[in-house]
Regions:
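Alpha-helical membrane-anchoring segments
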Residues: 1-145
Length: 145
């Protein structure tokens, strides 16, 4: 009987759950991404850390990632900000999280001297969030459907 009860406990892992915890993670993730983009612009770090250096220190093995021109870097920061806002409110979530991940990771990979360990976490978490149903609760997408 005890083994049957353990099996029953395992089947609850696959039962539908509530989406509020995923919504909280999505909102916090989007807010952190938006704040990181706003901080880059507000402190002038876009120009001093990403645009101005004549030589960019690259990550070993990732030298093939192109460094965009000045307008391209500013555009990437804008994409990070707008897509982070989209992730936060759950508006066109899949498009927002993919564009956030792409732009954020690109900015991270073009300059190794701007390394922050939580940025690597944002990259890994963003990659996972592409495949999770994070916009099923407390989002514009959920209200639309």
């Amino acid at each position: 009987m005890a083994s049957y009860q353990r099996l029953g406990a395992l089947t609850t892992l696959w039962s539908p759950g509530r989406g509020e915890s995923l919504a909280v993670v999505r909102i916090a993730f989007g807010a952190i991404g938006l704040l990181s983009a706003v901080r880059l612009v507000a402190r002038g770090w876009v120009d001093t850390l990403l645009v101005a250096p004549a030589v960019h220190l690259r990550y070993p093995g990732l030298e093939w990632v192109p460094v965009p021109p000045e307008r391209g870097i500013h555009l990437l920061v804008g994409v990070v900000a707008v897509s982070a806002l989209g992730v936060m409110v759950g508006c066109w979530y899949r498009v927002a999280i993919v564009s956030f991940w792409f732009a954020f990771t690109w900015l991270e990979l073009i300059e190794a001297t701007v390394y922050l360990n939580h940025y690597w976490f944002m990259t890994l978490a963003g990659a996972l969030m592409v495949f999770l149903p994070m916009a099923s609760t407390w989002s514009v997408d959920a209200r639309r459907h």
